[in-house]
From Swiss-Prot:
Membrane topology: Peripheral membrane protein
Chain's role: Hydrolyzes the pyrophosphate bond of UDP-2,3-diacylglucosamine to yield 2,3-diacylglucosamine 1-phosphate (lipid X) and UMP by catalyzing the attack of water at the alpha-P atom. Involved in the biosynthesis of lipid A, a phosphorylated glycolipid that anchors the lipopolysaccharide to the outer membrane of the cell.
Xref: CDD domains: MPP_YbbF-LpxH
Originating species: Pseudomonas syringae pv. syringae (strain B728a)
Catalytic reactions on record: UDP-2-N,3-O-bis[(3R)-3-hydroxytetradecanoyl]-alpha-D-glucosamine + H2O = 2-N,3-O-bis[(3R)-3-hydroxytetradecanoyl]-alpha-D-glucosaminyl 1-phosphate + UMP + 2 H(+)
GO terms, biological process: lipid A biosynthetic process
Entry's family note: Belongs to the LpxH family.
Protein name: UDP-2,3-diacylglucosamine hydrolase
Residues that, per the record, bind Mn(2+) 2: D40, N78, H113, H194
Any Gene Ontology CC annotation: extrinsic component of plasma membrane
Gene name linked to the record: lpxH
Length: 248
């Protein structure tokens, strides 16, 4: 069994999401061969040298899962693209490049965060290219912590404001980009997150059937894609209210 999740946006202000994730680690993930986290794992990440006590607790929880035998793979999202080798080493996980092709159930599957598919949002794509440049990353990682915190808040607020103003089709994936990149990597299954629009889309690429599986964000409920001998199953689950969790 292999599990894939994305867009948890973990932060101390959302203990319900944190509890649901920790429950997943202590339960179903212990029985899994691998856990893939496809970006926006944290709501914000300003550097491995600036881990808060909350983020450190998540790191330790991942390490416990890794030590139990489950392999963990982590991909950058647009909120946590500064996650580095230091965190991954401490958490016992492997950093995946975006995009990556992996074998799931004997089938090559393309994994992405999904933001690079939104090519109609030209302003965002330009900003993404700038922020992911090695020189920009080097500069960001060497800024004072206070400056990084302020910059992260500014970028997050601007991102939220711009997303609210943009048309839905602009912030969703570009339809023509999906078959193009699937053909480029020679796959018939694509799994990604980012858009917060969970679904399984059936496609036709040439004369072959294909599918695009969109993982859901963890806001009002959690989403998990489970891959096993039964196939690919995308499902959601409700969070346990924090008041109940505290009593157990």
């Amino acid at each position: 069994m292999i599990l894939l999740i994305s867009d948890l946006h973990l932060e101390q202000e959302r203990p319900d999401i944190t509890r649901a994730f920790l429950d997943l680690l202590a339960g179903r993930a212990r029985e899994a061969e691998s856990l893939y986290i496809l970006g926006d794992f944290f709501e914000v990440w300003i550097g491995d040298d600036a881990m808060s006590p909350f983020q450190l607790s998540i790191c330790k929880a991942l390490r416990e899962l890794s030590d139990s035998g489950t392999r963990i793979f982590l991909m950058h999202g647009n909120r946590d693209f500064m996650l580095g080798k230091g965190f991954c080493k401490a958490a016992g996980c492997t950093l995946l490049s975006d995009p990556s092709v992996v074998q799931l159930n004997g089938e090559p599957v393309l994994l992405m965060h999904g933001d690079s598919l939104c090519t109609r949002d030209e302003g965002y794509i330009r900003m993404r290219r700038y922020l992911r440049h090695p020189l920009t990353l080097f500069i960001l990682r060497h800024l004072p912590l206070g400056t990084r915190h302020k910059l992260a808040r500014k970028l997050r607020n601007e991102s939220r404001a711009q997303t609210r103003m943009k048309a839905n089709d602009i912030v969703d994936v570009t339809p023509d980009e999906v078959p193009r990149i699937m053909q480029q990597f020679g796959v018939r299954t694509l799994v990604h997150g980012h858009t917060h629009r969970p679904a399984i889309h059936k496609l036709q690429i040439g004369d072959q059937a294909a599918r695009r599986i969109v993982l859901g964000d963890w806001d009002r409920q959690g989403w998990v894609l489970q891959v096993d001998e039964q196939g690919f199953n995308l499902s959601s689950f409700d969070f346990v209210p924090e008041t109940v969790a505290l009593l157990n």
